[in-house]
From Swiss-Prot:
It is an enzyme of class 2 (transferase). Its EC number is 2.1.1.-. This is Protein N-terminal and lysine N-methyltransferase EFM7. It holds the Pfam family Methyltransf_16. One of its GO terms (molecular function) is protein-lysine N-methyltransferase activity. S-adenosyl-L-methionine binds at W57, G84, A85, A86, D106, W138, S165. CDD domains: AdoMet_MTases (cd02440).
Length: 254
């Protein structure tokens, strides 16, 4: 009898319906450029997410840098909303820079939301009483983001700044994103929109967001276009385009 006859080849097979556990969370360090305290933020990222919340993207870093640099104008004493926050880095920077309140949102996936809350709970220099972390679906009723009471929302209940960092690649969601911006930003506020072209062939679809915004009574004002090290250097296709980081303000015209 051969040795093979004694081997149960199904011994280590996964049972039917088995789902492997998700990868464990990992950490990424963000270094503030202005060297003020805290000089470094240690961000926990989810192990894996179909919503791409497991990566610290260039657009998020650029957004954080920009808000830190222009905090006196955009952040300090202001009401701030972030959409699609992933690890919540821009919101954390707003909190550290003494915003009046920051509401940090992402898709209501429990892993994503609990991970953002973890980063808030472990961030040095943050006044948690002025922060809210919650799930939100773009285009939905935005009133719960601003006020939980029954009163009608007024301009003063809305946000001075709405942050959209690396969201415009969701081309099917442009109208919902813009509706939420229209519903939540103050007449004298603005939206900060930052993105990198992850799919170079669809760059024009990304940029369509800044034309469509006019239908919602916004004017797009370009802030900057910089070139950074791309996220995935092993992908040689159109590396010069993927290295770009675009930034715009959407300014209300109503």
């Amino acid at each position: 009898m051969s040795d093979d006859e004694f081997i149960d080849t199904g011994l280590f097979a996964e049972p039917e319906g088995f789902t492997p556990p998700p990868p464990p969370p990992h950490f990424a360090k963000y270094q503030r450029k202005n060297k003020t305290d805290p000089a470094e933020l240690n961000l926990r990222l989810v192990g894996k997410s179909p919503l791409w919340g497991h990566l610290l993207w260039n657009a998020g870093v650029f957004t954080a840098d920009y808000l830190d640099k222009h905090a006196d104008e955009l952040v300090t004493g202001k009401d701030v909303l972030e959409l699609g926050a992933a690890a919540g880095l821009p919101s954390l920077i707003c909190g550290i820079n003494k915003c009046n309140r920051v509401v940090c949102t992402d898709y209501p996936d429990p892993d994503l939301i609990s991970n953002i809350q973890h980063n808030f709970d472990h961030c040095q220099g943050l006044d948690l009483s002025k922060t809210v972390v919650k799930g939100f679906i773009w285009g939905a009723d935005a009133k719960p983001l601003m006020d939980d009471s029954e009163k009608e929302i007024q301009n003063e209940d809305k946000f001075d700044l709405v942050i959209l960092s690396d969201l415009v690649f969701n081309h099917t969601e442009h109208l919902k994103l813009l509706k939420t911006c229209r519903d939540t930003v103050k007449k004298n506020g603005k939206c900060l929109v930052v993105f990198s072209p992850h799919r170079p062939k669809l760059l024009e679809n990304d940029l369509e967001f800044f034309r469509t915004c006019e239908d919602f009574q916004f004017k797009a004002e370009k802030i900057d276009l910089v070139t950074w090290k791309p996220m995935f250097e092993e992908d040689d296709e159109s590396i010069d385009i993927r290295a770009r980081v675009y930034s715009f303000f959407l300014v209300p015209q109503w």
